[in-house]
């Protein structure tokens, strides 16, 4: 059992702007794994930080915790137009991940947001909550511990059939996401390469989710596609950030070289993402037991 004192100490690391960002990230993921009201409170305090990357990750973790106690802070962040688009988008996605019907009116309102990534995210989150309410069941063979923005497509479809839905801009983003998660769950080279084609889509939100999924898959065949979007300085920084973190998860020598080249990028979100991704590379290539090592570090300081 983790004590209140331990949670406060880990929250202290997360909220200490003097600590390296990679340490604060590890503290955040430790709090996510601990869960509960005290961890949510500690995470919520960091939304006044000046790092959009960190705040976006706070919202992501609150969504993955699937605890309705986080809905108030997430609603506040979504409504706050002084927050960066990637932070507001992640707050909306987190509300969809928690899936409580109380979020429907606020998501409906912000589905018309002038920031396209926020509006699109609210539309997908609405579809997810309504899908949950419908009581439909789907064989979700998600091999990852993530709460996804949509369930996979129902029924057994081939890669060709799924790819046709996935790349069809006339389909709703929710249905395209469903096809993407079905392709991900197949975990074949053919399905990974089909997913990688989505990095050319016209929607920045879609491209960023594609990069996230490629990071989950950790397949080296996707490296050239992720590299191309990361290196494109005209690409949306939310997408470049997600490409960097995906390369960090794949963690080959090539990935490390690419990330080192962009660790001093003039876009802060990209630069910080490369730093975090290099820390992830270090973890993936080390005998370390756990990335979210905040508790172990606390014990080591005793």
UniProtKB/Swiss-Prot annotation:
One of its GO terms (molecular function) is deoxyhypusine monooxygenase activity. It is a peripheral membrane protein. It comes from the Eukaryota. Fe cation 2 binds at residues 208-209, 241-242. It is found in: Endoplasmic reticulum membrane. Fe cation 1 binds at residues 56-57, 89-90. GO terms for biological process: peptidyl-lysine modification to peptidyl-hypusine. Keywords: Endoplasmic reticulum, Hypusine biosynthesis, Iron, Membrane, Metal-binding, Monooxygenase, Oxidoreductase, Repeat. Its EC number is 1.14.99.29. The keyword Cytoplasm does not apply. This is Deoxyhypusine hydroxylase. It comes from Drosophila melanogaster.
